């Protein structure tokens, strides 16, 4: 009798999971850069974080994490990371401030290239993009694996650090440009940040700095209202491949 009740409970649990739309979307990270990257993950809306919130990814290595559905969050790549004598872990770009390899619910300090994904329930329509709204630190792309609909890759393959204007440059200890600020971060003005009184698309056109980002990476979000050519969709429960230096 106990076995029958246990079996029934198991079937009931599976049915609840199935009909509630529970589904894990595999998200794979691949590093094609010539240097090590430390990916970070951040779940939105103060919901539970993924099982991996930060890890080391050497050149040529791939690693995966499962995201539930529905789910929404962002991914980033930290560079030039090290651990000091006290054991504190920090990165020169996109540091999440946790003091550890794991970000533990902390986001990337800008400037940072971001991949944003919103996973729908029940195989509905997912949304995803590469965003440079918080600036740029390394090339990234996101591509659905499987799924139905358009399901095109969104990519920013250019190294914007090489053409970053002087006012936006972030330099490393060796004097090289290691990241490129957004105009909003650099100047903190409403016309660049799309904040009042410039908080509508018609009052916040893309500045020249954003146009430079857009020229280098046409598929990426370059400023707050840049969504017509930069938001991508896919349905049918696809997996996702995020590539550093595609």
From Swiss-Prot:
Entry-linked CDD domains: TLP-PA
Tissue specificity note: Equally expressed in the abscission zone and surrounding tissues of both fruitlets and leaves.
InterPro entries found in the cross-reference section: Osmotin/thaumatin-like_sf, Thaumatin, Thaumatin_CS
GO cellular component terms, semicolon-separated: extracellular region
Compartment annotation: Secreted
Disulfide bond annotation, renumbered to this chain: 33-245, 81-91, 96-103, 151-234, 156-217, 164-180, 184-193, 194-204
Signal peptide: 1-24
SMART domains linked to this entry: THN
Induction and repression of expression: Up-regulated in a tissue-independent manner following treatment with propylene and wounding due to embryoctomy.
GO biological process terms, semicolon-separated: defense response
Keywords: Disulfide bond, Plant defense, Secreted, Signal
Primary localization: secreted
Pfam families: Thaumatin
Keyword Cytoplasm: no
Keyword Secreted: yes
Similarity section: Belongs to the thaumatin family.
PANTHER family: OS03G0233200 PROTEIN
Function description: May be involved in protecting plant tissues from pathogen infection.
Name of the protein in its database record: Thaumatin-like protein 1
